[in-house]
Swiss-Prot record:
This is Indole-3-glycerol phosphate synthase. InterPro entries: Aldolase_TIM, Indole-3-glycerol_P_synth, Indole-3-glycerol_P_synth_dom, Indole-3-GlycerolPSynthase_CS, RibuloseP-bd_barrel. Pfam families: IGPS. It catalyses: 1-(2-carboxyphenylamino)-1-deoxy-D-ribulose 5-phosphate + H(+) = (1S,2R)-1-C-(indol-3-yl)glycerol 3-phosphate + CO2 + H2O. CDD domains: IGPS. The gene is trpC.
Amino acid sequence: MSYLTKIIGTKIEEVSGMQPIDVPVTKPISLLHVMSEGFHIISEIKRSSPSKGMIRETVDVAKRARQYEKAGATMISVLTDTTYFNGSFDDLRQVADVVTIPVLCKDFIIDERQLDYAKHYGASVALLIVAALHPTRLHELTRYARSIGLDVLVEVHDEAELRIALELDDVLIGINNRDLKTFEVSLETSIDLMKRYPEVTFVSESGVSTVEAAARLQEAGASAILVGEALMREEDPIRLLEELKTCSLKSVD
């Protein structure tokens, strides 16, 4: 059984127990517009993962979110999965309460109820993973997310999934360098797809821990990178974030 299959099985059980929740409906932001110019960093709150185990068990989520924003992050991603990533919707709320930049609810979303919870707890963006959803369901959840004021980041891992994502209108596409079936990581996943689709605005996700990696991805066409584990392992995430931002400054020079 792959990691993804196991996680989705758990999500099906979780969703069945989710109670109705108040959803404040607002106008969604245009994440695609935000990311279309320049080079951006999406910084992540990620306590653990199935492949790496515990990354940082004790963390002041609000403090770290403020550090991310201060250092120039364009958006903050928050893992809300509890079983496999030790995250929570409480983490999401703590981040949303203290920053002014967009906040991404990063989870394995398969149902509208999860989107309701994401919006209720302060997210402005939700992650939808092509590999986890039938194309019809992907379209349905995208429409529903926007109807309650959430923009979406649509995640792909290969060209077949990218073609499905491109059928959606005006969405930002993230390329996960981590294979969700095996959890193995390769930056070549992003580099290959970005070179073949230079007209698409892409976020490169996973496996970015150095300035050299960030620069390589930007040169290949990334408009943004999502950095989680590397920042969470840092006692001083501001330093690493500022170093990663130098890629953007050098491109301007």
